Amino acid sequence: MPAIRRFGTLRPVLAVLLLLAKVQSIEDHFSTQPEITNHLDRSEDTMADNSSSLDAQFVSQSNSFATKLYQRISAKHAGENVVISPFSISACLSLAAMGAGGLTAEQMYSVLEFGAPDRKQTVADNYRRLMERLATDSTVNVANKIYVMQNYAVKGAFNAIATGSFRSEAESVNFAESAAAAKKINGWVEEKTNNKIKDLISPDALDELSRMVLVNAVHFKGTWTYQFDPSLTRPFPFWLSETESRDVPMMNIKKHFAFNNFEELGFSALELTYGGSDMTMMLLLPNERMGLAALEEKLPTLNLAELAGKMHKQEVEVFLPKFKIEFTRDLNEDLQALGMERMFSDSAEFPDLLEQNEPLKVSKVVHKAFIEVNEEGTEAAAATAAVVRVKRALINRLKVRLDHPFLYALMMGSSRQTAFVGRLVKPDQSDVTQANRHEEL
C-alpha cells in the first residue's frame, strides 16, 4: 500500500481579468505621455480615517453581489462542481468602476450592490481597510495589477485610488505584441497564485486596440486548526443521485466545531477554522440527499453572519471528502444579464481612466478559480452531505457525513464577508486506492 502523503492545505485561488479596449479603430496620433504616477493624491479622499473596521453595509452589499452572481453561474453549470471568488470579481470590477462615468457607472455600482456612483469614496475607503486587514493575514495573498498600453498614461486621480485603496501597481506593455503581453500577464498571475492559475488570458484577446487590462489575483492557503489524520481517510460512497454513488477519499475527524441543524430551512451548517487566520469555511449540507437545488434557491434569504451567530460549538464527528476543483468562466454574459450592459457597448463611459481622451469599453471579463481541500487544510473549498447526513449517534454526539452535494463558503473575519463560494457535486475518485476500504459508519 502506497504511503499516505501528509501535504497540502485548504487553498482557494482565483484570478479575474478585465480587458478594456478602444471603441473604434482610428489612427493613433498620441505622442509619448508622461510616466504613470505612483504617488497617492489625498486631496479628495478621507484616508485620514484610521478606522480598521469594515462598514457593515459594505459587507452586506458584497455578499449580496456574491449570492446573485453565484446563482447565475451555478444555474449555467448544472450538475458541475463550481468555485468562484466573488471578492476577486467585485474587487476587479470596483477598480474599473472608479474610472467610470454616466450610465456605465450607474449600472456598475448598482449591480455591485453599492448603490449610486456618489458612494465612490465610501467604496474606496472600505477596500482600503479590507486590503490593509488582509495584508496582516499570512494565509491570504491579494494582488491587483493594471497593465496599460505603452505610450498611454493613467489619470492621476484614478492612479491614486488604485494604489491607495486597491494596492494596485501599473505597468506599461505593448498589447500589439499579443503573445509577449499575454505571457507577461499570465506570468504575474501564476506568481501571485502560487502557480495554481495558469493561462488566464490568451494572446488572441489582445491587440493594438487594447488599452488597459485590470487583473485581480487571490491566493489562500490555510491549515486547519484541527487537521484530519490521513490514516483515517478511507474510500466511502458519495451520492451523485438518489440511486448512484461513487467511492471517494473521505476524511474523518472528531473535534469541537460550530454546528447547527436548521431543520426549518432544510440544511445543517458546520464551520471549520484555520490556524493563524480569521478565515473560516462554512459547509451547508442539505438534509435531503438531493436537496442542493432547494438550498441554492434559498441563498438570497440567508445571511451567513447571522447563521454563524446561531451555531454552537459541540463535539462533532465529521466525514468530509477530499476534493480539488478548477473552474473558468467568461463573465461577460453573466454581468450583462445582471444589468452591467453599457460597459461592454460602444457607448461605454470610462472618462477617468486614461489621460488620453479616447472612448473605451470593456471587451472581456474572465474569471478562473482553483480550490483544493485535504487533510491538512484548504487551497479553495467545497463540501457535501447525505440524506440525513447530520444525525445524532449518541446524546450530545453528532455525526456529520458530507456524502452528497453541498455548498461551501470561505469567509473573512467576524463580518463573514464571502471570499470564495462554490459547491461539490462530483468529488474526484483519485487517491481512493491509497485508502483502506471504510468500515460501515
Please place each PLM-identified region on the residue numbering.
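Non-catalytic, conformational "gating/processing" segments within enzyme and secreted inhibitor domains
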Residues: G79, G115-R289, A294, G309-L394
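Extracellular glycan-recognition regions
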Residues: A305
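Extended hydrophobic
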Residues: E191, L214, E264-L284, R389, ...
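Short, positively charged
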Residues: R5, S60-L69, T378-R397, V432-Q434
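Non-catalytic interaction/Regulatory regions outside core domains
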Residues: P2-A3, F7-L10, A21, P34-T46, ...
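Detector for small/aliphatic-rich hydrophobic stretches
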Residues: P2-A176, N436-L441
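Catalytic and substrate-binding regions of extracellular carbohydrate-active enzymes
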Residues: P300
